[in-house]
Every structure is written in structure tokens, then in C-alpha cells.
């Protein structure tokens, strides 16, 4: 089973939520039982992955159901990528000029093995970081690639940490060619239009202004300190993308027992898609 529903505004999702939310907890439990019996398939190749290779390491199903270096939300993003390729919106993986904003993660290694023209990087502001010189160092606010150099950009769990999100979105639009795509996963304030602002950036050499108790998420290249959350984007993110130069912006709600795509609070995973 694979279900993808596309939303371009909050109200269209609210209608579904009001109609279906009471039955979602039972649907999640049934899906878990199905995965335990049948296993899943790889999101790009459709190769079967048996149940004994699935790892569920906690209750947050969006971040687990791990297999072959991918978790639930990452498979959701790759399903959307595959659909764009199959629809002729993007070139096949062996010809696709792609950038992913991570380089040392299992997800990055999965792509590095399949996308010959992949560029990958980490954010390494410290001049003495041990990864300097081993992987590319890029700031998502200014990727540093020529205009229209890319056909696809993937960002996973990045936008909540970006100090100047509007600036980053403009920069991403500039490095994509006309018709190129941004795909991203992020924690979403799915019930509201406004983003939840948790901290404000005040400059490179100034501590950020904290508007609430600081929230830190895990960061594979800064495991001791993590990464500060500046905002949890709401549905206004779609309008921010349109202002940044994207012709279309939408959120895909993906769920699939066949591919192991589930959430817990919601039985879906949101994948952001924006077309240049």
C-alpha cells in the first residue's frame, strides 16, 4: 500500500484531519503488524527487505523503522523523488545533478552509491573541525555553487536549524535550474499557518536570542552539543518558498506499509516539494 496526498494550503489538510484523525491510531497499529509480517521494499529499487532486517528503536516511527541506512521519513522523501523521475520531471539518477545537505550519514552514503553526479556537504563552521578537508563544508544559507548548477536539492531536518531561513530558500532557488526541485523533510507545525519561533539569530559573533527554553536536536557532526532549533515551520513555509522564487510549493503526505513509511502522532510523513 502506498498513499500520497498533496496539499498546497493548511485548510485542505485540516479537512482530512477532521475526517480521518479518530481512526489514525488504530491504522498505525495495524500497519506495524503488517510490517512485522511482510517486511518492506526499498523505495528506489523495490527490492524486498525482510522483517528481520527492520530495526524499530523507539516510539517515534517517523525517525525509525530503519533498514539499509534509511528510516521512515527518508524513504518517504525518496518515494517522492522516484515519482518525479518516473513522471519525467527529473532525469534518471545516473544523469541527475543533485545536492544533499549531508555527507557522513547513512542516507548520504545510500545516495553516494546510486547518484554519480551527487554533491554532498556538512556545515562545519569551526576551522579546526576534524571533518574539514575530508568533506565539503557548505552553509545552506549560501551553498556556494553557480546559478542553475543543480536539478535537485535534498534537505533533511535542516530548515528548523537555519538562522536565516528566508535567505536560505532564496539561495537554494538560485542554484536550481528552471524546472528543478527542492525536496525536504522537517518537523512541521502541521496544525497552524504560523511558524513557531524559538530563537532569533543576531549575527555570526553574537549569541542567539532565546525566546523559550532552548531546543537541541542531534547533529552527527556535532554530537556533543547538537544543533539549536530556531523555528518549527508552519504552513507559511509554502508562501516563503513562493516568495523565494519557486513556482510551486506543496506538502506531500506519504504513508505506506509497502515501503515502511509511518509516523506516530500522524500515520503519515510530510515531504516538502518545491519546483523552481
Task: Pin down the residues of each PLM region.
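Hydrophobic beta-strand segment of the Class I
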Residues: 153-154
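S-adenosyl-L-methionine-dependent methyltransferase catalytic module, highlighting the catalytic core
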Residues: 2-20, 26-40, 127, 163-275
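A short His-aromatic
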Residues: 157-161
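Conserved N-terminal segment of class I S-adenosyl-L-methionine
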Residues: 1-148, 199, 256, 260-274
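Aromatic-residue hotspot detector
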Residues: 51-52, 150, 244-247
Amino acid at each position: 500500500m502506498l498513499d500520497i496526498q498533496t496539499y498546497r494550503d493548511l485548510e485542505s489538510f485540516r479537512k482530512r484531519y477532521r475526517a480521518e484523525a479518530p481512526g489514525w491510531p488504530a491504522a498505525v497499529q495495524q500497519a506495524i503488524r503488517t510490517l512485522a509480517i511482510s517486511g518492506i521494499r526499498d523505495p528506489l529499487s523495490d527490492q524486498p527487505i525482510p522483517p528481520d532486517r527492520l530495526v524499530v528503536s523507539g516510539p517515534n516511527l517517523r525517525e525509525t523503522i530503519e533498514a539499509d541506512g534509511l528510516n521512515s521519513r527518508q524513504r518517504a522523501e525518496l518515494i517522492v523523488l522516484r515519482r518525479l523521475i518516473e513522471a519525467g520531471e527529473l532525469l534518471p539518477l545516473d544523469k541527475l545533478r543533485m545536492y544533499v545537505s549531508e555527507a557522513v550519514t547513512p542516507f548520504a552514503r545510500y545516495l553516494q552509491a546510486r547518484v554519480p553526479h551527487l554533491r554532498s556537504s556538512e556545515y562545519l563552521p569551526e576551522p579546526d573541525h576534524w571533518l574539514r578537508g575530508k568533506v565539503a563544508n557548505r552553509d545552506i544559507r549560501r551553498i556556494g555553487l553557480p546559478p542553475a548548477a543543480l536539478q535537485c536539492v535534498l534537505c533533511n531536518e535542516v530548515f528548523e536549524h537555519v538562522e536565516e531561513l528566508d535567505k536560505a530558500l532564496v539561495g537554494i532557488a538560485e542554484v536550481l535550474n528552471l524546472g528543478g526541485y527542492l525536496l525536504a523533510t522537517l518537523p512541521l507545525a502541521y496544525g497552524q499557518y504560523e511558524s513557531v519561533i524559538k530563537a532569533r539569530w543576531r549575527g555570526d559573533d553574537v549569541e542567539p536570542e532565546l525566546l523559550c527554553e532552548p531546543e537541541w536536536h542531534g547533529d552527527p557532526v556535532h554530537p556533543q552539543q547538537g544543533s539549536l532549533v530556531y523555528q518549527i515551520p508552519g504552513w507559511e513555509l509554502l508562501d516563503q518558498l513562493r516568495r523565494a522564487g519557486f513556482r510551486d510549493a506543496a506538502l506531500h503526505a506519504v504513508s505506506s506499509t509497502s515501503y515502511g513509511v509511518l509516523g506516530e502522532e500522524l500515520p503519515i510523513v510530510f515531504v516538502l516539494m518545491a519546483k523552481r
